[in-house]
């Protein structure tokens, strides 16, 4: 009679089908959780990339705006001896606004701020740095064809044309703006300027004095791109950007004010 020798440890056995299924279930849960987190990370990365693009667009716009603001009101009449002979001759002295400098219509002089509103600002300055005065406008929907676009116009100032009726040449700087008020203005003493619905321009003595007292401009942009949705929340992506800049040059619109040229 042959004897069969048992091998292996006493009581040793393989996995049961139930144990194998439990192990596979646990492994599936772990792998599923890992892939879920990877998917969330990918969605977040995509969202942040789009937000970064919007932020960079806003940053470029604000940089351009700050460069322009630094040139507001230059060159102005303080830099010239008006008793000397000019070639060509000085512009016809304006008589419509006796509180303003008589030569605000001369294209060699930059008046400074000419109109302010919550979503609109008009001013003059040599923004190219070559001494040629430009008429600059930043305005939400300036062209009338892009409701949520902050647009910029730049044209060379024309002599004997009122600063507020200079031509415009619109270009879009930022799209999809939802800010209720892009611009906020502060006077020389830090007091915030209250803006009426129609804005403030120099066509009245009181408003001209307000413009000649503006020292600081705050800009607040909130951009919501309806075509780029956060894949995690399902909502359009929003990006905000704030900045503040101070005026360095004087105003030709009123005399005796903190920022006046005369």
Describe each region flagged by the PLM.
Residues 1, 73-89, 154-158, 185-195, ...:
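Short regulatory "switch" loops immediately downstream of catalytic or recognition motifs
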Residues 59, 70, 147-153, 248:
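Short, cationic motifs built from Arg/Lys/His that form the positively charged side of catalytic pockets
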Residues 129, 161-162, 167-168, 172-262:
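Short linear sequence signals and composition-biased patches located at protein termini or domain-edge surfaces
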